[in-house]
Each structure stands twice: as structure tokens, then as C-alpha cells.
Amino acid sequence: MDMSRRQFLKVTGLGILSVAGMSALAGCGSSSKGSGSSSDSKVAAIKERGKLKCGVKKDVVGYGYLDTKTKKYEGLEIDLCYQIAAAVLGVSYEEAVEKELCEFTDVTPKTRGPLIDNDQLDIIAATYTITDERKKSWDFSTPYRTDHVGVLIKKNSGMTKMADLDGKIIGVSQGSTTKDLVLQMLEDEKIDATPEFKEFPDYPSIKSALDAGNVDAFAMDRSTLKTYTTDDCELLQPEIEFGAQEYGVATKKGCDLSKTVDDTVKKLQKDGWLDDEISKWGLL
């Protein structure tokens, strides 16, 4: 059947629009393999912005802590962020610190993943434990620190051993792996105890609950607990080391920034910088 001129132009026009639309969609998802660049490049975005957006803790002394007097963040993970910023932006560590080439945002175990996913942050350096499950969603660097879980109690609690946790309420942080690790420890040590768990949005809230008697214990990584160990508190059976936590820097899954971050951490391990930092911040 012959096609009129109007019909021909309509069909041809639709075809052109269709091809153009497909090309545009392809550009959103990826770039040409041969181009060596991408509109989705995290490294390029950071260089254009001139700063690295970092998710850190504000309440863990030695790792990520916001000094309320100076209004500045300090700790091993803060220094590590500046090292990564220096590597990405092609400047020295000293220059990165002096020019404040990191933009810090407080994160919690519940918020850190989503902030990476929606590109509000470039990296997370916030005592973020590497697990097989988490590696399905985010990229992690080589571990820069290994810690263990501890259980903080009041000295007058009457508890002297892990078995005394039976029926007690343990405060843990939302989105952390602590609950599972405590239960695994009780099973591994063949300790007959069934505690309850209560989740809190942040560490200060758990400590406040412990002080108020709303929970009987505060379980978390030992380095974190060190921040909250006051004169009237102590670790329950500190000789039981469990729940080894390997901390890594998290980045968006599959992004080009991941390699730079991992290479930087490996270099800092090799040249002894990380060991010096651990000593500097009293994390031995």
C-alpha cells in the first residue's frame, strides 16, 4: 500500500525521536568504553567541586569526634579523609588539611548507607564494619583498623560475668551488627543467657539510658565504649574478646572513586602512617 507524504513524515519523525531517546537514555546509564570518562564519574565530580564529601562520626573519640569548643572534627578517620582528599585532588595532605578540602557530615549506622546511595556523600569513614552482606551494596576499602565488641555496665550492677546478662536489657545502635555479635558470642562461649536488646539512634542516647537505668548494659565496639567509660562504669568480662570488627572506607558500589580510596589506604598501611595514627589517637 502506498504511503502518503504526511504519513511518511510522521513515521520517519517517530523513528528519529525513538533513536534519539534511546541514545539519551544510554548516556544516562553509562559512557562509551573507549572514552575513558563518564558523566557519572565520582572522581571528576569531586575535582570539579574541589572538596571531598565525607560521612563521619561526631561522638567517637579517637576516630571521629566534633570538638564543641573549636567546632572542628578530629580523629584517625578525619585524618584519613584528608589523605583521601589529597589523593583525589592531587595535593599534599598538609594542603588538604590547611585548605579544609573535606566537607564533613555526621552519620549514624542507620543513615550512612543511604547518604552514599543518593550521592550526598562521596565516602563514609565512620567505624563502618565490613561484612559480606554490606559488600553487596557498597564498595569497601582494605581494612584500616580492627576492633572488638565489648559490653559496658555499671560497677554497682552486680554483674560479673556474661551469664549475668540473662534477662537483662542491652542497648545497641540502630543499624549496627552488635546484637548479632553478642548473641553469637554467647553461643560460641556456650553461655546460657538470653538478654533483650533495645535499639537507639546514637551512642549518647544509649549511655544516657544506661545512666538512667533504662538499660542494663551498653554493647558496642570497644573503641567506641572507651569514649563513654566513666568512673562508675566498666567492661563486663573484658578478657572475652569477640566480634572482630574490620573498619573500611565505604564508597558507592562500582564507582571509580573506590580504587583511589583503596589504593590510598593500602599506601598508608605500607608506609606506617596508619600505625602512627593509631598511636597518636590512643587506639592501641
Predicted stretch roles:
Residues 9-28:
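N-terminal export signals
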Residues 30-34, 47-48, 95, 99, ...:
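Ligand-binding clefts/hinges and TM-proximal coupling segments of bilobed small-molecule sensing domains
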Residues 40, 47-123:
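Extracytoplasmic small-molecule ligand-binding "clamshell" domains
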Residues 43, 73, 77, 127, ...:
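A structural signal for short loop-to-beta-strand junctions that line the ligand-binding cleft
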Residues 54-61, 73-91, 129, 146-202, ...:
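Bilobed "Venus flytrap"/periplasmic-binding protein-like clamshell domains
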Residues 58, 145-156, 222-266, 284:
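Periplasmic-binding protein-like
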Residues 94-163:
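Acidic, polar ligand-binding/catalytic clefts
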Residues 111, 125-137, 181-185, 209-243:
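A ligand-binding cleft/hinge motif common to bilobed small-molecule-binding domains
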